[in-house]
Design a protein with these regions (language model features):
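Active-site gating loops and adjacent loop-to-helix segments of metal-dependent hydrolytic enzymes
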Residues: 5-39, 166-185, 224-246
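Mid-to-C-terminal alpha-helical segments outside catalytic/metal-binding sites
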Residues: 5-58, 86-94, 115-119, 206, ...
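Histidine-centered divalent metal-coordination motifs
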Residues: 7, 162, 212
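Active-site gating/metal-coordination segments in enzymes
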Residues: 57-191
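Catalytic metal-binding/acid-base residues of hydrolase active sites
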Residues: 134, 164-165, 195, 214, ...
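Aromatic-lined glycan-binding groove of carbohydrate-active enzymes
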Residues: 196-198, 202-244
């Protein structure tokens, strides 16, 4: 949450968003819902201190998902993306040996998203783009977004996908189910559309990193395959099996269970898994390496891939 964007929003209430202070603590207010703005989201020194505590050498910095701002009018969305991207670039410039930047894009206007992506790659050297699992309910596999995905592919960037809302509303009331169930569900819906739509066949070099261990994707891939074999409707746009397409995705290691992470590694290979933290939020890891060490039968090669190798490859630093 770059300070420049925070200053721009402070006290404003246009489009239902602004930043406010309560007892000296800054909050982001989005149409009446308050979210604390942790110091690590905007203060480089605090970010580095947290990384040191977690034994993280290099971190890719991305915006907090509630601030994708896909619901804003196109011009306002572009302005918000520019503020975020330039703010992240300034953070990275403070400590370029330890921080990398991820772009955020105004996906409500695909043409503007392409222009902004080309700008941040040229001006800031970003190698990654953070996107929501959907854009106000429209899937990333929708044809209207294909040119954005193609530009990401052509520029050699990868996509980091993180939900910002739960598109499936029924049964999600209470117990924070919109997060615990809804976020992984949104991830599997997003991945399924990319697979079955033929988008991944068309975009052969597109790399997509999914948060939270891929949601339910790696654990239900057999069901995807079964449908593709036995139901013609699943083969309308692609003849490529979902299991083959699974290897086109990358995943963070944030599964909250060592046996789940072991299964993920066995399904896709350690070279497609990278450390994830969800920092500084309460659903993340405070000791990601310690969590990794709990994985049964983890080999030194697998550990090296997950700790370093996969991230280096995605960022073009291998």
């Amino acid at each position: 949450f770059p300070t420049q964007r925070s200053s721009h929003l402070k006290g404003r209430s246009g489009n239902g968003i602004k930043t406010v202070e309560r007892d000296g603590v800054p909050y982001f207010e989005n149409n009446g819902r308050l979210s604390a703005i942790d110091i690590e989201l905007y203060d480089v020194d605090a970010k580095l201190e947290a990384m040191d505590r977690m034994r993280v050498d290099v971190s890719a910095v991305s915006v907090a998902p509630p601030t994708y701002f896909y619901y804003l009018p196109p011009e306002a969305g572009l302005h918000a993306s520019k503020l975020s991207n330039d703010g992240i670039a300034r953070m990275v410039a403070r400590k370029p040996d330890r921080l990398r930047g991820m772009a955020t894009l105004p996906m409500q206007d695909p043409d503007a998203a392409i222009v902004e992506l080309e700008r941040v790659v040229k001006e800031h050297g970003f190698k990654a783009v953070e996107l929501g699992t959907s854009v106000e309910g429209e899937q990333l596999a929708h044809p209207k977004f294909r040119k954005v995905l193609r530009t990401i592919e052509q520029l050699g960037c990868f996509i980091f996908v993180h939900p910002y809302t739960c598109t499936a509303k029924g049964g999600m009331e209470g117990y924070d189910l919109f997060n615990t169930i809804g976020f992984p569900l949104d991830e599997v819906i997003m991945a399924a559309h990319l697979m079955f739509s033929g988008a991944l066949d068309e975009l052969q070099r597109l790399r997509v990193l999914i948060a939270h261990g891929g949601g339910y994707v790696p654990y239900q891939i057999g069901r995807f395959d079964c449908a593709h074999r036995n139901r013609a409707s699943a083969r309308v746009n692609t003849q490529t099996s979902p299991r083959e397409l699974l290897r086109r995705f990358y995943f963070d290691a944030l599964t909250h269970d060592p046996h789940s992470l072991r299964l993920l590694i066995d399904q896709v290979g350690a070279d497609h898994v990278a450390i994830g933290t969800d920092n500084p939020f309460d659903m993340g890891y405070q000791d990601p390496l310690g969590e990794l060490e709990k994985v049964p039968d983890l080999t030194p090669h697998e550990r090296e891939c997950i700790c370093c190798g996969t991230a280096r490859a995605l960022l073009g630093e291998a």
